[in-house]
């Protein structure tokens, strides 16, 4: 598959964000929900709906959601590329695809993780309330629109502090149902969470409880687009579409992910405040027990305050990106091969 430049991605995102309706042979941009704001403005959540030319209404349906956090931009490129490829080959579409590129448009406009002014994480208000405040109302309408999908993929980037390798995260309560999809998602890593740690007000938790199988993907770092990670996930999405009978294109080559449970993941935290300097450069991946992950240094007295050492043979799949750290800051996650 060919991938255009980020400039094309931004141009496409601008069109999707501000156009109200666009109809051609296979796609239609619909307004999912709108809420009036002060000074004659309003929040509008849009989706791009695709179906085959001779749809019967019995086709499998995939929903692709991103932009819940306004500082997560990888999903914008992913949406662009999925839309571009479907529009380039509508004859290969045999099912329904709904693309929701921006659930938190206020946050996206400001580059803020949550909803500006309200200091609210959009991913803590699902499944929402049709009679609730603005965020709850929007969340409820989005959930209602997604219900009926055969599968939902909720695409996230990390925040501006931690870089994540492409991964799928699952609640162990839903693992049996979701693992077959997670394994063909072209991720480096599949992390199965304990149900004790699950935040119940997330989109994924709510949809899974409502009967819509939902995968959560994480990759990259906030306010950036990692082309390689996006392309990896895009191949995974088309692989899923082929598996669901939604797409008749050539099946992409996907990697076999590393499978994990929470007990196999080591969390490495800082013991000192200072600057974290990675010894891994831009690369995460395999590491041996005792190898350096990085150092915490003091720019005042020129000393290494803490050497960050891998506690086990394994895979580094999360790594501190912002170098300014404090005692207790998460520096890395290592999947330990025991």
At which residue positions do the language-model features occur?
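Structured catalytic-domain cores with a bias toward divalent-metal coordination
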Residues: 2-338
């Amino acid at each position: 598959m060919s991938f255009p430049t980020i400039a094309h991605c931004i141009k496409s995102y601008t069109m999707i964000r501000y156009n109200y309706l666009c109809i051609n042979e296979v796609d239609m941009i619909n307004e999912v929900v709108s809420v009036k704001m002060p000074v004659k403005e309003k929040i509008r959540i849009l989706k791009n709906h695709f179906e085959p030319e001779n749809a019967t209404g019995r086709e499998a349906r995939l929903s692709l959601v991103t932009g819940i956090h306004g500082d997560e931009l990888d999903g914008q490129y992913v949406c662009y590329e999925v839309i571009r490829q479907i529009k380039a080959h509508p004859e290969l579409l045999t099912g329904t695809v709904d693309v929701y590129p921006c659930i938190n448009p206020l946050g996206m406009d400001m580059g803020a993780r949550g909803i500006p002014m309200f200091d609210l994480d959009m991913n803590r208000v699902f499944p929402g309330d049709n009679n609730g405040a603005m965020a709850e109302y929007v969340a409820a309408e989005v959930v209602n629109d997604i219900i009926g999908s055969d599968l939902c993929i909720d695409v996230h980037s990390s925040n501006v502090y931690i870089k994540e390798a492409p991964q799928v995260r699952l609640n162990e309560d839903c693992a049996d149902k979701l693992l077959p999809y997670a394994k063909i998602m072209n991720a480096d890593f599949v992390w199965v969470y304990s149900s004790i740690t699950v935040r119940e007000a997330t989109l994924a938790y709510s949809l899974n409880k409502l009967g819509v199988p939902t995968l959560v993907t994480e990759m990259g770092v906030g306010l950036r687009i990692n082309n390689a990670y996006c392309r990896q996930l895009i191949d995974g999405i088309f692989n899923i579409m082929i598996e669901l009978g939604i797409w008749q294109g050539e099946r992409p080559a996907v990697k076999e992910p590393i499978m994990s449970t929470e007990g196999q993941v080591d969390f490495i935290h800082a013991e000192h405040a200072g600057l974290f300097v990675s010894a891994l450069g831009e690369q995460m991946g395999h590491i041996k027990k005792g190898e350096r992950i990085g150092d915490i240094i003091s720019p005042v007295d020129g000393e290494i305050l803490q050497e960050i050492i891998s506690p086990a043979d394994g895979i580094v799949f999360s790594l501190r990106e912002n170098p300014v750290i404090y005692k207790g800051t998460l520096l890395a996650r290592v999947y330990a091969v025991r």
